UniProtKB/Swiss-Prot annotation:
NCBIfam families: PRK00596.1 (NF001861), rpsJ_bact (TIGR01049). This is Small ribosomal subunit protein uS10. It comes from Magnetococcus marinus (strain ATCC BAA-1437 / JCM 17883 / MC-1). Pfam families: Ribosomal_S10. The keyword Hydrolase does not apply.
Amino acid sequence: MMESQKIRIRLKAFDHRILDQSTGEIVQTARRTGADIRGPIPLPTKINRYTVLRSPHVDKKSREQFEIRTHKRIIDIVNPTPQTVDALMKLDLAAGVNVEIKL
């Protein structure tokens, strides 16, 4: 493959423990096949907050807030070997982790 080739993997999840476990599996697989790794780089956590009224009828001042946090990581694989690409395609990650791969 070309010298300047790079694979960028973006991972998103609501649970940071599952996300860290998945990044560890990807890094371990890439290192085992002889690729050079940059990361995992933690990106800012996006927090979506939803405010709803507690009462269905009155009490506008009484509200409840819910939030959902989206944790993100980036892993760059520099100079991947064909074995690295095959191993990453066969890798089975936990449910709840969104994976985006750019070449």
